[in-house]
Structures are given as structure tokens and as C-alpha cells.
């Protein structure tokens, strides 16, 4: 057996001791409700941090006192377990540990990070990459290989911080090498996180790699200044000034793809899904700046991601307004097998807030689905059902005042566009209306006309009366109200 094989065998033996040596352990770490058993002699031999820790605890192998408060990454102390029946009790055949097991609570690092640190201390080897396609906390992508996702980058950064805290420089260097390969395929916001970590830990090679990647991302200095310190932005601008590629890329549109790596066709679908999930989380948090960063730095297509449709369904008016003002999304983009626009969804939701903000940003009130249905047809159908049935299936709590206001807003927009086109106005959208077989309109036409006459006065008067009589205190739907409640959509776009 060669010396290399002997070292590998020794490494595996020590790693097996960490995994299966509970019966011989004399210390355990309690992290996130789980116990990680270890051995003081191994940890003290491999780490100066643990040597100093254990030298101050229980030198005569008596039941140890509670450990003193520890500096980051561990805090607090816990009592020792009893010999046979404690938490550090027997493993395997039921024998008791040679010495009472010391249990140390760890609260500032997570379980996966602690296990990685201990694996390196025992075997001299560790990898921040999770098992291929296996679960990794923080990553919800199915089948993700965790080679460049945000969760893998976060795990590597946490491991780097723990290695520095424990004084394990070999592990820190190993993680640095792995991060250098990860950032070349990571998103630009993850690269900026690694950039700041490399600055904190004074890792020059990692800093150089990340700074050049950010410089090549195409993000403007103003946008970088919102996410990075000004001195870091200045250094990135210096790199750009020295690079001939920066001058060539400068005239390009800020909404063209600026990603610094060619896409791998095998993983393009997973990349797209990951971007959409991150975009939706950003919209849920009203973080439009992050969405803008994804558009400019990663080439996110907001129309392909159905960003406006999602924001209309799940966010408030302000988020939809800010998203449309980015100028990177088509307000009339279509989604789903029927080709609905965001205005169709707002009409189905009976949300005056969404209808008004979409119309303010040039949504087409005459847009049709593949079935020839316009937003006005949707509202007329809901109104007909409300008049004849008293309630709309799936929208049992529909407010008639909101329905009237939505109908008036869309009808007014249709009249304006029809007048601008020079065509006669015949009942709202006659020139582009849907087939009569889709929405029966002949019997309810008179009711619809009377319903929409003077709708503003009816809306304001009934809203005030309802507030006085029932004390509900609803705000008038003038664009300053709260976002519409979640509703059932009979023909969702997904």
C-alpha cells in the first residue's frame, strides 16, 4: 500500500469515528435541536480554538461545570450529561462513554456548517457542494446540483466564516478555492456577496476574481452604489476603465443581457425557473431594485417570467406601478393557453386599483384572448351573473361598487381608444367585442346600461352609506386603498 493510500485510509477511519463513534465521544454540540458527537482529543489536536476551550474545562475528568460563554460562533453553556443515561449515553452495544459527555450548545452557526468544519478537522477533506440533486436548506429548486445556486454560495460563505473563527486556515483556503469556481457560474447578486466576504477576510485572489466579474456584468455605477460601498464601486470602475471590453459594452441598452458566461443548454430550464422564483420573492418583498438588478445583470425577461401578471395577482398597486415604470415589461403581454393580459386578470379580480394602474400605463382595453374575449367582456359577464344570480361563483364576497367602478374605468378607456381610432362607439367594444355566444348580452343590455350610468356618484354614495351604517370604514377605491384580497381565478393564467 502506497503512502497516499495509507493517508486516505487514515482519513476515512477518522471520518468514520466522527460518524459512528458516539460510544467513545466525550463532547457533543447541540445545534438546531440536533446533537453532533465528537472527541476532545481530536479537536484539540487539530484546532487551537478547541485546545484552549477544552484546557479550561474539566481537566480532572470530573463532571464538567457549565462552559464559559464562548466567542462567535458558539455562545452559552450547558450542563454535562450523566454517564450511562444522559444525552451522551451509549451507542452501539450499550456501553457507557469513558468520561461523562460534555454538551455545548451552539447557536450562531447552522448544523450543515458545523458538520463541514468537523469533517475537515477529522479527515482533512471537505466540500461545500451538497450531494448532487440532494436537498440543501434555502434552495427550493428540484434537481438542483447546488454548484452555483444562492444556497450553495451561502453555505460556502458561512463555512468560510466558521473556519476563520475556529482558526482552521486550511479549510478557509479550501473554501476559497471552491468559491472561485462557484462565482464564475453564480448570479451577479451572489457574486457581490462573495466580493464583500473576500474583502472582509482579505482574500486577494477571490477579491480579484469577483471584482472582475462584477465589472463585466454591465451594471451601472449608480446601481452598484445601492448594493456596494462607494470605495468598492470606485475600484470596479477603475477595472472597467482599464478594460477595452468595457468601452465596447458601454453603449448597449441597460436591458439587454449582460451575463458574463454563456448559458449551458442542459441547465437553461433550471436557470429560468430559478430566476423566476427569485423574481417572485423580490416582488413579494416589494424589492423592485432587485428585480431591476436581475434584468440588467442576468438578462431576466420580465415578459417570459410573467412578472406583470404575477404582480397583479399577488402584490399591491405600488409594486405593479414601480414594475411597469422600469420600462422592461410589456403591459399587454399575454399568458397562458388563452392568451390573457394583465388587464384580463385585473378584471377577473374586480380590482379597481389594478385596472386603473394598468390603464395608466397604456394597457389595451380592447385586447382579446384567443377566444376573442376582452376585459370589458369579462366585467360584463361578471355583472350579468351578479344581476341574475346574486353572487359570482368563486367571488362570493364581490363588492358591487368595485364592479361598477371597474366597468366604468374599462368602458371609458374603450371609448377613448375608439374615438382616437376614428371608429364609432357602439356599446363599448362593438368593433372588437366578443361573440354573442360567449357572453349573453341581449337580455341584460338594459340592466347593464342602467347599472353603469352615473357610476361614480352611485359608487361614492353607496360606499359612504355603507361606511356609516355598518361602520366598516372601508377606504374609497381611489388608488390609495389596500391591495385587493386573494381571490379564486376561474381561468388562471398559469
From Swiss-Prot:
Record region (Disordered): 60-94, 421-443, 469-494
Zinc finger (C2HC NPR-type): 136-150
Residues holding Zn(2+): 139, 144, 146, 149
Disulfide bonds: none
Pfam families per the UniProt record, alphabetical: Ank_2, BTB, DUF3420
Domain BTB: 25-130
Subcellular location: Nucleus; Cytoplasm
UniProt pathway annotation: Protein modification; protein ubiquitination
Bias (Pro residues) ranges: 61-71
GO biological process annotation, one example: induced systemic resistance, jasmonic acid mediated signaling pathway
Membership in a protein family: Belongs to the plant 'ANKYRIN-BTB/POZ' family. 'NOOT-BOP-COCH-like' (NBCL) subfamily.
Self-association and partners: Homodimer. Interacts with TGAL5, TGAL7, TGAL8 and TGAL9.
Function comment: May act as a substrate-specific adapter of an E3 ubiquitin-protein ligase complex (CUL3-RBX1-BTB) which mediates the ubiquitination and subsequent proteasomal degradation of target proteins. Transcriptional co-regulator involved in the promotion of leaf and floral meristem fate and determinacy. Required for the abscission of senescent organs, probably by regulating the cell wall disorganization in abscission zones (AZs, e.g. pulvini at the base of leaves).
Protein name: BTB/POZ domain and ankyrin repeat-containing protein NH5.1
Organism: Oryza sativa subsp. japonica
